[in-house]
Amino acid sequence: MSIITDVYAREVLDSRGNPTLEVEVYTESGAFGRGMVPSGASTGEHEAVELRDGDKSRYLGLGTQKAVDNVNNIIAEAIIGYDVRDQQAIDRAMIALDGTPNKGKLGANAILGVSIAVARAAADYLEVPLYTYLGGFNTKVLPTPMMNIINGGSHSDAPIAFQEFMIMPVGAPTFKEGLRWGAEVFHALKKILKERGLVTAVGDEGGFAPKFEGTEDGVETILKAIEAAGYEAGENGIMIGFDCASSEFYDKERKVYDYTKFEGEGAAVRTSAEQVDYLEELVNKYPIITIEDGMDENDWDGWKVLTERLGKRVQLVGDDFFVTNTEYLARGIKENAANSILIKVNQIGTLTETFEAIEMAKEAGYTAVVSHRSGETEDSTIADIAVATNAGQIKTGSLSRTDRIAKYNQLLRIEDQLGEVAQYKGIKSFYNLKK
């Protein structure tokens, strides 16, 4: 009864109006699952391949018909007849069918869409929530959210090199309250920006993209918004995080961090050592709890120095650095580079590999942050993954745009469903930092 009888993919649009995949999996019992695939703007060079058509006459070359055809004509034939509950076997079969190290033949977007849809169909068959199916009876931790309220870098037209300025309600008693805190700060920030005559249009992830005078102006403005909303900045209230996305402004030939790419003439150009110094200055000055991709994805020496200097005080998250890949994570653990991994399901391409990366991180004392992409959909699977794995943290955008809010609303539902079992750890989510 739980045998897969049909797999079907179609092309749909993501939050940027670009094509992506939606996959449906059907079983003998009538149980059904649907998965949608996100897409990134700033992507690591080691990520699994997102298959695009390249036909400039259609969707500017970004069409996904090849990936759709791969699902409907190749993957479907291979997995029809499998028990939908056998997630690992299905994921392994798709990996073998692709046969490349980066899923470049069938496309990670094709494989991931099927992987998500299979899990959802299995949960439907068993008549349990997705987070329960994925995580079992020990599922209980609601993630502390990283809320991206100011967008810079490749996510907006704002003249700021750092891609994301985030707030984290680490002092909130519950996820529901933490979400309220974040929303109130978001609205306080909007009011402050208006009073300064700055634009309040939002970027890809729902954060504002104003023309600040630089990084510190952005941080100072967020601190004012926290205060205006009636909260305190720090461990008992709200703390700040960055996604530097440093690979986006790292000049490989000159081996420098060239802030002029986003901030224009007169902006800083820093060596690897100077980049570490700069980040340390910011940490010393402001209530910063997390920094993502503070160094370029290939600047291993820089990462090791940054970790030595700040790794006990601040969460140092590898995104482009690790690309949700256990091979890169294992090297980072061995060489003491970073202390946290960002988990993006489409960077690696299957739920099985995603869970393996989270497990490896936890075993090494690294934290794991489950994350969206800048090109999102209404699919809320990552909310269930965050709770299923007790990851403790989620990064899913600002407090606007339905593609972001869909994940927050799903977490509110999960917290309600878990009832008294639900835990929100806040500052304790950073279990590898010494306070």
From Swiss-Prot:
Q: In which pathway does it act?
A: Carbohydrate degradation; glycolysis; pyruvate from D-glyceraldehyde 3-phosphate: step 4/5
Q: What is its EC number?
A: 4.2.1.11
The compartments listed are: Cytoplasm; Secreted; Cell surface
Ligand binding (Mg(2+)) = 243, 292, 319
Tell me how the cofactor is bound.
Binds a second Mg(2+) ion via substrate during catalysis.
* Cellular component terms (Gene Ontology): cell surface; extracellular region; peptidoglycan-based cell wall; phosphopyruvate hydratase complex
Q: Which GO terms describe its molecular function?
A: magnesium ion binding; phosphopyruvate hydratase activity
Please list the reactions this protein catalyses. (2R)-2-phosphoglycerate = phosphoenolpyruvate + H2O
Active site (record annotation): 205 (proton donor), 344 (proton acceptor)
Q: Which family is this protein grouped under?
A: Belongs to the enolase family.
The subunit field of the Swiss-Prot or TrEMBL record says: Homooctamer.
Name of this chain's protein: Enolase
The source organism is Streptococcus pyogenes serotype M1
